[in-house]
């Protein structure tokens, strides 16, 4: 049950990334998602959210890793999705 919840939260993030037009560096069906963001978007989001810089894609884009867990709430994901939509 716990594993299903974290993957479901990650899939919500995945859909938000794709809706924003961010490609996926790695196509993952797990609780880890790897969108490719502009460096500017990385700079904005890193002030409020924890994620890992995965790899520089080019001078203007960076692949990052978002990871959900058993403790990731709907509110956590809702807040990130809302902030993504504002970018």
Please name every model-derived segment:
Residues 11, 15-85:
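Conserved C-terminal alpha-helix-loop-beta "cap" of PLP-dependent enzymes
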Residues 1-3:
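Short, surface-exposed loop/turn motifs that are enriched in glycine and acidic residues
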Residues 7:
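Ligand-binding pocket scaffold of soluble enzyme catalytic domains
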């Amino acid at each position: 049950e716990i594993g299903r919840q974290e993957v479901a939260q990650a899939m919500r993030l995945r859909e938000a990334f794709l809706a924003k037009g961010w490609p996926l560096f790695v196509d993952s069906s797990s609780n880890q998602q790897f969108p490719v963001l502009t460096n500017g978007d990385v700079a904005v989001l890193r002030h409020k959210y924890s994620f890992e810089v995965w790899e520089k894609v080019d001078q203007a884009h960076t692949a990052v890793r978002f990871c959900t867990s058993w403790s990731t709430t709907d509110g956590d994901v809702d807040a990130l999705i809302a902030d993504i939509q504002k970018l």
